[in-house]
């Protein structure tokens, strides 16, 4: 299935909050996490602040928002150009497989190139086989394994533990 040619990818605007929030919650539900509302409010404010290195976009099919993407530009010790971390990507279940995920990724590629970034990269859960089929077509697997240590207990918690 291919994306509807009328699907538009548009940078987030203040008036998009009501369309963004259900997608943001759907993304959290997909990964079985419960992000506190104050963190979501801070995230929204950062996404709209041009002084912040984070940005986002929504995919629109007509009047309906059907996908979101957030990305963060940051310095790298390996290049003089910045890197772009594609942190969040979510497409409504009803339109998955239609090419919207690819369009959102391509939007990030274009934004990162415009900003002079040397690389776009992202993570996904090892069980997200459907998404990985797309990712294998639009990027290269790095072979790296992520390790992490949460330093602020309770700020980011699985929904099962909330």
Locate each region found by the language model.
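A short helix-loop-beta-strand connector motif used in the catalytic cores of GNAT acetyltransferases and
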Residues: 46-58, 85, 141-143
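Conserved GNAT acetyl-CoA-binding A-motif
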Residues: 113-123
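Conserved acetyl-CoA-binding loop-helix of GNAT-fold acetyltransferases
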Residues: 91, 97-110
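A short beta-loop-alpha structural element at the N-terminal edge
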Residues: 8-22
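A conserved beta-turn-beta hairpin within the catalytic core of GNAT-like acetyltransferases
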Residues: 64, 74-86, 96, 143
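Conserved beta-strand in the GNAT
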Residues: 56-58, 64-73
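Conserved active-site alpha-helix within GNAT-family acetyltransferase domains
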Residues: 102, 126-145
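Conserved GNAT-fold acetyl-CoA-binding loop/helix
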Residues: 21-46
